[in-house]
Amino acid sequence: MDELPNRERAPRNRTITLSGEERERYSGKLLTLTHSMAPGELRNRTIHGDLLAILDFLPRRFVDLLFIDPPYNITKDFGAATFRRTTEEGYGNWFSSWFPRLLAVLKPTASVYICCDWRSAGVVQSIAEKHLIIQNRITWEREKGRGAKSNW
């Protein structure tokens, strides 16, 4: 796993970080998928990998709760990969390219939480509601982050 840069954090930042020793101890417990596995082999395990690369290895209809936090529609480096900001239509096309494939792993009674930025929330919801029943949207005020003061 890549090391995060050691930088000064804002006084109210509560980001959890691991020491080198903790990273070594916990990374040994991560599961890297290279082939299909039965639900019992995955239960109570933490899978480490690129979702799009391992999606076809996941069993069908075994997920009770899906929490996804895809890249927001901003240009950002993620270690070796970079996500580039695009148009709303482009972001929707990208989201649609993988999101429906993910639904096969859900149990019929599963709950899904999707994180997104306020600019992309509309397109994400319009795609999600083609496949799911939307119960609620959760929005919270962030006191940190880009433009937080001017957003509220």
Say what each PLM segment does.
Residues 1-152:
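Core catalytic lobe of class I
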